[in-house]
Every structure is written in structure tokens, then in C-alpha cells.
Amino acid sequence: MHQHIQVPPLEGKSRINYVNLPLINGDKLRTAKTLVDKAIKEKKVFSVQGPYPVIRAGLRARGWVERRLPRPSFSQPRRHDHETETTDEGDSSDEDDLGEEVERDDEAEDLYDLMSRLVRHETPYFYWTTRRDSVDCRSLRKEQMTNHYAKAGSFTTKVGLCMHLRNLQWFDAADPDTFFPRCYRLGAQDEKHAFIDDFRRTACTSLLLYVLEKYEGDSEGEKMGEVHNAKSHGLRKTRKQHSSQRIETSVIDSALHVCQEYLNSLEHCDIDNNLETNSTISEQQWKVFLQNYYLVVHEGINIEGCEYYLERCKCMLEQMRQVCPQMENDGICNIWIIKPGAKSRGRGIMCMNKLDDMLGLVDGDHCIMKDSKWVVQKYIERPLLVHDTKFDVRQWFLVTDWNPLTVWFYRECYLRFSTQPYSTHTLDSSVHLCNNSIQKHYQPSPDRSPSLPAECMWSCSQFRSWLAASGRAALWKAVVVPGMQKAVIQTLLTAQDSVEPRKASFELYGADFMLGRDLRPWLLEINASPTMAPSTGVTARLCPAVQEDTLRVVLDRRSERNTDTGGFQLIYKQAAVDVPQYVGVNLLIEGTSIRRPRAPVHKSLIQSHPEPLSKSTNHKSSLLSSPCTSGKENQSEEVKRACPNLPNRKITMDQSLIFHPKRKRPHRLVLPSTCCVLPNPTELHHPQRLSHTQPQSDRPHTHRTRSNLPTLYRPTPSVEVINIRPRQALTSSHYIHKIHTVNLSYPVLRMQQNHRRSKNTFAEREGPKSS
């Protein structure tokens, strides 16, 4: 212990306090060194941020030594005030956890202080922190453990939960609308318009339900034998009657029309409707309808002759219930809850029931609108009530691995009650928000049932006893618990690809549920770092047990697989997916060189040349020509002027080939005679006139250009004959004679060639034979 000795001040000098440092006991020092050496050898050094006396005590009992982190100065502005303005992932707070400090044992604390000083330069292998960003997971070794996963905001934030649950259809055959109230981001324009449509459609169904319940009463709840007969909550309040004012029945017709159009859209019947028959309600008509709806539901103004619409309203509501699983919770007041995504612990949450007020509130905050932080969610207007008081359920679950996904569900939970009786005619947070951080600022209302505790909490065992008194004890295990487990698993499946699956990490979460009148659980949100403050007698018993059982799962079970896990039970474990082994980057490009494409094979023996050919030497050896573009009017006129009208002609090519297979070199192709008779050029534009001529031979030929073949050097199409060869090899010299006849449209051109040439002349042209 530090001893402060006060010395009487001398004259003219101020008083000075002298501090005597305590003497270190040798036995205590040796004990500390022994424990520290063993902990360092076994890698059992931990660090805890915040009080958490249960975590510290549990780790010390297992032989761990704490390396204490520097404590923040309370004289400085608290860091969490800034952080919680930018995140809504958890509901834990250092201020709530201050009450966790247990009575100190001075002797033990001195030993722990000494051991902490001895390991001040050692590496902690276990981190337990309140906030995720207190430890950089990327800089941790693979054997270092921490109680947070990186990038878990995909389901622990209001925006992330709203977005990821929409992808549930890709992971499970389930509809998120069956366990999560429909939710929209008002910062996204498409979702904002979807919310407006949803609000208007809900107003229509609420109006029909109002008409039905006003004249028939809420007999459906009595038929179902519900725990609490919430008979027309929207009609309980005594409202001022406006006997002189009446609303026309056209408002009911509009509501029926909107509901029918919605049903048609689900059946895709609206696709066949023409634009002329499309009777979409205009914005002005919607404005008038909502004003009438507010007057009827909120002000109590009667609808003239609405009793004649009871059967139609009942029939339409039955059809809507089949396609809208949340219709039983919607009620008649059309209340929505607005949550600013940058705050947690119930701060900034408001309940509203008018569309213009909600849009005006969101549009006024441009910063939050820019980041899409505002979230609007349908309020559950008809929850299960205990003694006419609203409550929600806090349920813990633990994730120890994301690949494969491993989920542990805690067997016990607790209920948080409101301090005020439930009513939909007041939108005060003390009635509709059950967060302990909000309700602790209010005193229980004298109108609330005295059967409820003043600390506004029940354990799950107390709730089961209340259900048993109503004859519904079996529904806890048959409906409530399976529904909560299913909602947790399906939510984690949608976020699995977004979270970094670090093997040595784990995280404890707190899920908030509400129960419908049929005891079906509805997921509200999931909190990271749930508060462990012993604020009431219920949490003083449950929170330490949850922390101790968490250490059993994440530490004791690693060394002993069959160890007791306390209140945690394994509810889900995926099949393991093998991660490909990383062997480094080895980039290799394989392929072949690109070959030069071959020239296309020309099957036609006669081609047209639309442009004049040059007399240069290049054109003398060129036998290929471009296609004729005689389809153009200007070119056809030129052809008519250049060529007079001539009768139909034909071209006959008499070809002779001489082959000597016994010799080393084959003889060249010779053309004994060629006779060209060209037809009228005007008939080129009418190919059907030439159909009476002989068809061109379909015999395949292999074309190869030769310099000695005839070419018509004219400014008009020419004739080209290429490499005519026999089909089979000849055993001796044979003379082959072929005649090809084709139609042309030019004057007669006659070319004479010798039928045979002497061997000497042929040899001279071929040059000397190669040896």
C-alpha cells in the first residue's frame, strides 16, 4: 500500500506530500516470476479492454497472465462518444460496465500488478475488447485470439442487415419477410420509392381492416385463442366525434382497387393491360386518399355507408393475407420506425405514422441521406403483450468459425419490458422502445400492471411460467426457440461471404426479437459486443454465466473436445470447404503463333472488272478482279453508253492438254484456240434472261494462275481460266480436249493459238532442265 506522510510546512514554504513506494516481498516476486515464466512458455498472456471482471477471473483461473492496456483518462473526452456516432454495431458501453467492478482483494491485485509489469513486453495471445477497431486483425499472428471478426457490419448494422437479408433466396429456400419486418434505406432513391408504395398500400389494407373491425370486432383473435386479446388497439382511445363530417365511400373503393392491382401484379396480370386501360392513381389522388385515411383512423371520422362493404373488405383481406406474411402485425395505424444508421442503443429512433413527416425528416439531413444511413422499418403494431405491456427478447449466440460456419445458441435469454402500458396512439419512445438504456430513465407508470417487476426484466423461465398459466407452455420449444434459431442461421448465411473468416477469432452477439400474437419471433437487430452490465437481478445472474461459458467454448474445448460448454449448444455447423493452397504466383502464357490466313478459293472461272485496268506490268500478271457493281444507276448508264445493243452471244473456250507422265517435268498448259463471243451488256442487269443458256459445270476445279492464259485487257470484265488438270493419273501420253461455255456481255474477241507446239520450242521457253 502506498503511504502518504504529511510533513508540517516550514514557515514561508508550501506543504509537500512525500510518497513512500511499497517494498516488494521476495516470496511474492518469486511466485510472480514462476507464474509469468509458465504463462510465457504456454503462450498464455492476455489483454482486456474495459472492466469485464468475469473474463479476467476466468482467464486467471486457467493460468493466464494479463498484460494490462493503458486506461483512458476520464478527464479527457471519452472516445466512445465519437465512435458511437459513426457505428451502430453494438449496445455495450463502458459506462454501463463500470458497475461490474467487484470487491478488490488488495493482496491478489498487488500480485497481478506485479505479473502484468513482468509481461509488459510480451505478446498477448488473447484479446477481449469492447470495440472491433481496438485491435487490427491484419497484424495479428495466426495463434493470437480476439473476440471480434473483421467486416461483420454486414449483419450487425441496420443498413447491412437490411441489405443482406434480401439475398436470402440464394442461400436458403426461405422468405425474409416471414421473420424480419420489411425495411428500406431512405438514402437510396429506388428504395425510397419502394417505401412510398409500401406505405400507401399498407394504408389501404389498414383502412379495410379498420372498417371490418369497427363493425365486426376483433373476433379473429378470440378464435385463435391468443394470449392477449388486443381488441382494436386503434379504437381504444376515446376520440372526439365529428358528427357533422363524413367521408365518402369512394375512399374504400380506392383501397379495394389498389389491393386488387397489387394482387394482379403478383400474378403478372398487369402485363396484358394496355396503356389506355391502365388506371393508375395519380399523385394528387394519393394525397387526397391519405388525408381521408388520416381523418378516419387517427381522428375517428366515420365513413358514410361503410357497412355495405364488409363482405368485400373481408374477402380482399383474406387474399392479401395469403401474399403478405406480415399483415397480422401491420395493424391499422400504419406506424413506421425510423432508425438513424449512425447511432446505437436506441438513440435517435423515432416512431411516425405520416408519410410527409418521415420524408421531411430524412430530406432535411443531407449528410445522412448522402451516406444512405437512414433506415425505415415497419413497426409491429400488434405484438404479444404481457399484462398490456410491450417487451422484447435478448438472445445470445456465439460464432466460433465462418468456414465452416459454426453457431452456438445460448439456452437462456431475458425479456425487457417497457415502463408504460402499450398504446398505438402515442409515439413516445418510453412506450415503444424496450432498450434498457432508454427505459432506465423512466419510472414505471402507475397504470402498468403491478405483476411486472420494477426493474422491467424477466428471465425466460419466468416467461415460460406465464405461458404455462395460459396453457401455452409447449409453444416455447415448438415455436419460439426454433424460430429464433432459424432466423439467426439464415441471417448469418447471407453475411458469410462478407465476413473475414479468421480461424483464431470468435464473437459473441446479442439478437433482439419481438414475438407476434401467435408467438412467432421477429428479428429486430443483431448487436456486436452486447452489454454485460449487471443492471438488474436478471442480468447479474445471466451475464457472468454467458461470459464464463464463452471461455469454455473458445478455450477449454480447444484442448478437450468433450468438455462441458455450459449453456451454449451447437445448433449449426456447415460442411467444411477446402481452401486452395497458396503456392505463390506463377504466371505463364501459352499459345501458338498466328498464321497468315490463306487466300479464299475462287470457284468461278469468269469474273467481272468494273474499273478499267491499267496497262502497267502489275496488271499483266494479275488475274484476280473485283466484283462488278453494276447495280448502281450511274455505272449502268455508263455501260449502256459504252456498249451498243448487241444480240446475245456466248463464249466458247477450246482447251487442249498434253501430259507426259514418264518425263521428269510436266508440260505446260496450251490453249489451241479460244473463241469469245460476248452478249449484250444490258442483259447483265437481268440474269433471268440468261436462264436458257447452258448451266455452268459443277465439276470441281483447282485453280492456279498461269501467265500464259488469255486475259481480256479491256476496261470491262475479263475472262480467266485457271489450271485445268485431269482427274486421274495417266499411264501414257494422252490428249485431253475440253470445252467450257459461259455467257458474257461484250463484243467478240477471237484468239488463235497453235494446237501443238514442238518440243524444242517448249523446251526453250522452259529453260534448261535441272540436273
Swiss-Prot record:
The cofactors named for this UniProt entry are: Mg(2+)
Q: Which residues take part in binding L-glutamate?
A: 437
The protein's matches in SUPFAM superfamilies, at most eight in alphabetical order, are given as: Glutathione synthetase ATP-binding domain-like
Q: Which GO terms describe its cellular component?
A: axoneme; cilium; microtubule; microtubule cytoskeleton; sperm flagellum
Q: Give the positions of the site Essential for specifying initiation versus elongation step of the polyglycylase activity.
A: 345
Q: Binding residues for Mg(2+) 2, per the UniProt record?
A: 525, 527
The positions annotated for binding ATP are 339, 345-346, 377-380, 390-392, 434-435, 525
Q: What is its EC number?
A: 6.3.2.-
Where found in the cell? Cytoplasm, Cytoskeleton; Cell projection, Cilium; Cytoplasm, Cytoskeleton, Cilium axoneme; Cytoplasm, Cytoskeleton, Flagellum axoneme
**Region (Disordered) location:** 70-106, 605-640, 682-713
What keyword terms does UniProt attach to this protein?
Answer: ATP-binding, Cell projection, Cilium, Cytoplasm, Cytoskeleton, Flagellum, Ligase, Magnesium, Metal-binding, Microtubule, Nucleotide-binding
Q: Which Gene3D superfamilies match?
A: ATP-grasp fold, B domain
Biological processes, Gene Ontology terms: axoneme assembly; cilium assembly; cilium movement; flagellated sperm motility; protein polyglycylation; spermatogenesis
The Swiss-Prot or TrEMBL note on domains reads: Two conserved structural elements specific among monoglycylases, IS1 and IS2, are involved in glycyl chains initiation. Two conserved structural interfaces likely constitute the binding platforms for tubulin tail and microtubule. Arg-345 is the main determinant for regioselectivity, which segregates between initiases and elongases in all tubulin--tyrosine ligase family. A glutamine residue at this position is found in elongases TTLL6, TTLL9, TTLL11, TTLL13, TTLL10 and favors glutamate-chain elongation, whereas an arginine residue is found in initiases TTLL2, TTLL4, TTLL5, TTLL3, TTLL8 and favors initiation.
Instruction: Report the protein name in the record.
Output: Tubulin monoglycylase TTLL3
